Structures are given as C-alpha cells and as structure tokens.
Amino acid sequence: MRIVIIGAVAAGTSAAAKARRNDDFAEIVIYERDKDISYSGCGLPYYIGGDIEDINELTPRDVKFFKDKYDIEVKIQHEVISVDPDKKVLIIKNLLTDEVFEDHYEKLVLATGASPFIPKIEGIDKKHVFFLRNVENARDIKSFIEENKPTKAVIAGTGFIGFEVLESLANYSIDVTIVEVADKITPNLDIDMANFLENTLVKKGVKILKSTSINKILDKEIILSNENTIDADRKSTRLNSSHGIIW
C-alpha cells in the first residue's frame, strides 16, 4: 500500500502517524510546500511576542523524527501542482530545484489546511503588510519588529489568532488599532460577550473601528472604506497582520 499525504502540519502528520500504526508495511510519503512541518499554529503569536524564545519549540518534530520513528518520508518544499484521481498520479514541483516529476498513490490524503484570504486592496503587497499563517510568516513579522521598532500597528479582522497577535504586540508597547468589517468584534461570539471583550480592550488602550474595512494602504497611512484614515508617525511604523483566514 502506498499512501501519499499532501500537507505536513497538524492534520497531515497526524494522519501519517495513524496510518503507520494501522499498517506496519505501508509506504507513506508526505509532500509539504513549506520548509516547516508539524508546528503549532496557535503558538505563532507567542513567538512574535517573545513568550516563546526559540522558534524551534514550535516545530519539535522534523523530517528526521518522522523517518526515524515512523519510517515516513517527508518531502519539504515540494508542491503538488496537480492530481489525476483516475490514474492516481500526482505532478509535483521541487521548489528548491524547479524539477517537476510524477508520483503515484493508492490512497491519497488531502491535509492542506486553510489558505490566507488576500483581499484586493491597493498596497497590500507592501513590505510592512503581513499575514500570519505559518512559521515563516512569524519569523518575518518578528524580524520586522526588531529591525524597524514600529510604534503603531493595525490588525485587520478579529479572529482568535488576531487577538493573540494583539497581546504579543503589547509586549513591544505598540499602539494597536483593530479594523473590523462587521458591526461587532468577534462575529462568532454572542453580542454580550463581544461587548464585554470590546470594553476590556478599549480600557487597555486598543482603538477599535467597526463596520469599516481597509481600502488602500500607503506608506504613511491607511485609507478606510468610510474615507477616514489611520496615520503612522513615521514611515514603516505600521504592522498589518491577519491570521490568514479572516482579514
């Protein structure tokens, strides 16, 4: 039995380990387009904030671990670019060498997780705009903070990871503005809990803008859908961060 798994974060590596426990003789291969595997997404903001000092703590199980413990081959920085379910054939690209090759499977597991929603906003490709989806994103954000010493940040969206980022930015004494398109923060919470959370954040100095969205990102300001602006006190002092699903 040849089992191929696409994705090597939480679901993919868990599926691979379970498959090995069920079958001692199966050939198991995981393809992952990033270079980090089996990491804790919930821990990413706490690396940014310094609560987790060593980023390797987020990735305790590497390629060698899965090979030695489970005899599972993990191919990092390999992207599956097409699947032919009739022929059970995959087309894979090695992102390091640009080599494209075929592989086959008997059983296929899709464990690719979520992808960041990137809205069509002018300026979203600027260097001080970030998404938080994986370990590499966390590295980039932390490096930006340490190198540029920003004093202000904008968080677009009020998902749970965004709030963890908010807490982490407080460790750097960064003033934070939250922009939420809905008429209340944390749309999944009941109104009483959302109001309680909002009041608590406001008391702690967080500025919250509801029922609005970001229309344009410039070097020194953000233009909102209601035509108001969010100013920065110097160039590159905004860190725009989202958790990759909710913008």
What are these regions (language model features)?
Residues A19-R21, G43-Y46, V89-L90, E122-K126, ...:
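Short, glycine/charged-enriched secondary-structure capping and boundary segments
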Residues M1-V4, K64-A156, S211, I222-R238:
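FAD-binding core/adjacent interface of flavoenzyme oxidoreductases
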Residues M1-E73, Q77, L166-L189:
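Beta1-alpha1 glycine-rich phosphate/pyrophosphate-binding loop at the start
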Residues I118-P119, F163-E164, W247:
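Glycine/Thr-rich phosphate-binding loops of Rossmann-like dinucleotide-binding domains
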